[in-house]
Amino acid sequence: MDHSEVKFTNKTHDNILKMELYGHRNDLANAFLELQKNEEFIISFSKDTHIEITTKPISKGYTLEYVCKNIFQENIENVMAVGDSENDISMLSLVGYSYAMANSNKYVKIFAKYHTSAFDQEGVVMAIKDFLYRKSQK
């Protein structure tokens, strides 16, 4: 079976919220460009070998905003988010305290207000400590 073949369809199913494609980034590049033509989806590289496809408006940012507003009644400006992939951009661009991991690509880092170490270097722990410090200074 040839795993590099990708077939596209305009058929959608109302219950599908998320799909993922895995492969080499070069192999996925054509699929990425083709999928971006469909305005019903949010398409992003999650990792170099992984494309995430979600139905609009579903995204990490949308979900975080919904949870803050409807469950915790918290202003999103008071919330932190840590991310390292393109599928984190929607979340990083919404919160008041956004952290990009050191292993993030340059594009993701543009959307973060702050930066932290890589995941395997306790970057999440460092981001939480920084967030708590910044909140204590207000």
Predicted regions and their residues:
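Mg2+-dependent phosphoryl-transfer enzymes with acidic/Ser/Thr/Gly-rich catalytic loops
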Residues: 52-138
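Conserved acidic, metal-coordinating active-site core of Asp-based
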Residues: 1-91
